[in-house]
């Protein structure tokens, strides 16, 4: 067991193109969002294990001795593919939670317990440690916050238990794990996601692990080679929506108007493929024309999504505001409210960006200036973290 403090971060994700079409076998492009989740793991010898999640007001601690006495044979031995619904029920018993608890606070604690007990059972004794996780990502907004949480937990626990090495080299501010170690982190993070979501696609944890951009189609996930980092505005309309209902609405529209809706889905697929091609070209040398093409694809996709019936007045307003400032936007994720993204070309001047952000805030939206194509899960030195992150990890 390592004795040093570990500081780990992982990015969120946005869908660039292909939302809804992906449900019908088409390509989706998911990109790592540089709003990150940060984890601090502090080993100690007080015989307790603590979990602090200041964003959602969770503070829990357990005696290691009592966890040690639990029959955890149901977890399998270091097998990251063995999680079943029965295991989740058993974890609820262990945590003293009601059987029907499905709120984010309870599920976050269950995912932690699952990963801690499973990964650390290789140790002679369960380790005493404190884990604090603080995130720049809003929860429940379709931005992969639970996957970033699971990825941070898996990476930190695997490193602390010396299942994988700490990749941080002397004199470096941040370190990334090898491909083989990332595979293991991703496997465990997927199990954490299964505790939280039941039956996730695996896209969110893969994007958070590897960063950059991924292509997803019918269960197959592949990385795009060296995608460019694109500056964006991420806007949360704060209009709640149900992904399940929106997906069902698209399906019923497809059944009602197959000749109309099937070609829309094919067109969205073509938009995703064209975007993938452009991003590939940009890896070598981005040109102003590339950015103009990306903007055209954003506009076309937004209109297609409106035709599928997953738009919303708040998203129309978002697009109108950004268009008035010469920028191009689309919804990201399920639609019906939720979040949108706006591409910031390199030639957009500072005053225009600030004016756009003010106008969006004036609509009651939350707005972040950030980037996509961000690095995946990383380990950091304390000195390299922003003061706001340090403060977040010290809160509660």
Swiss-Prot record:
GO BP annotations listed: cholesterol biosynthetic process; isopentenyl diphosphate biosynthetic process, mevalonate pathway
InterPro entries: GHMP_kinase_C_dom, GHMP_kinase_C_sf, GHMP_kinase_N_dom, GHMP_knse_ATP-bd_CS, Mev_gal_kin, Ribosomal_Su5_D2-typ_SF, Ribsml_uS5_D2-typ_fold_subgr
Pathway field: Isoprenoid biosynthesis; isopentenyl diphosphate biosynthesis via mevalonate pathway; isopentenyl diphosphate from (R)-mevalonate: step 1/3
Pfam family, one: GHMP_kinases_C
Cofactors (names): Mg(2+)
Enzyme class: transferase
GO MF, one annotated term: magnesium ion binding
Protein family: Belongs to the GHMP kinase family. Mevalonate kinase subfamily.
PANTHER family assigned to the protein according to its UniProt record, in alphabetical order: MEVALONATE KINASE
Protein's UniProt name: Mevalonate kinase
Species the sequence originates in: Bos taurus
High-level lineage: Eukaryota, Metazoa, Chordata, Craniata, Vertebrata
Gene it is expressed from: MVK
């Amino acid at each position: 067991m390592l004795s040093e403090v570990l500081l780990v971060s992982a990015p969120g994700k946005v869908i660039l193109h292909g939302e809804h079409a992906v449900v019908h076998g088409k390509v989706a492009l998911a990109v790592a969002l540089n709003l990150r989740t940060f984890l601090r793991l502090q080993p100690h010898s007080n015989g307790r294990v603590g979990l602090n999640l200041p964003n959602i007001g969770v503070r829990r601690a357990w005696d290691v001795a009592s966890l040690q006495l639990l029959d955890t044979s149901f977890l399998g031995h270091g097998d990251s593919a063995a999680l079943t619904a029965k295991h989740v029920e058993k974890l609820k018993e262990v945590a003293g939670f009601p059987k029907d608890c499905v709120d984010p606070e309870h599920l976050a604690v269950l995912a932690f317990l699952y990963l801690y007990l499973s990964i650390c059972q290789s140790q002679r004794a369960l380790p005493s440690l404190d884990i604090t996780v603080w995130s720049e990502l809003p929860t429940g907004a379709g931005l992969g916050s639970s996957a970033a949480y699971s990825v941070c937990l898996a990476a930190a626990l695997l490193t602390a238990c010396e299942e994988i090495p700490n990749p941080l080299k002397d004199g470096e501010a941040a370190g990334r794990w090898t491909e083989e170690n990332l595979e293991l982190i991703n496997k465990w993070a997927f199990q954490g996601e299964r505790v939280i979501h039941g039956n996730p696609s695996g896209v969110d944890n893969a994007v958070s692990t590897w960063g950059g951009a991924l292509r997803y189609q019918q269960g197959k996930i592949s990385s795009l080679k060296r995608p460019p980092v694109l500056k964006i505005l991420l806007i949360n309309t704060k209009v709640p929506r149900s992904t399940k209902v929106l997906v069902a609405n698209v399906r019923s529209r497809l059944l009602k108007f197959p000749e109309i809706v099937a070609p829309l889905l094919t067109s969205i697929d073509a938009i995703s493929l064209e975007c993938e091609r452009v991003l590939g070209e940009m890896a070598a040398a981005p040109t102003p024309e590339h950015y103009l093409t990306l903007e055209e694809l954003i506009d076309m996709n937004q209109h297609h999504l409106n035709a599928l019936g997953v738009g919303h007045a708040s998203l129309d307003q978002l697009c109108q505001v950004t268009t008035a400032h010469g920028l191009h936007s689309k919804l990201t994720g399920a639609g019906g409210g939720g979040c949108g993204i706006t591409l910031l070309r390199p030639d957009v001047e500072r005053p225009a960006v600030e004016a756009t952000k003010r106008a969006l805030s004036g609509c009651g939206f939350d707005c972040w200036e950030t980037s996509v194509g961000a690095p995946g899960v990383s380990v950091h030195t304390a000195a390299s973290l922003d003061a706001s992150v340090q403060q977040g990890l010290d809160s509660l």
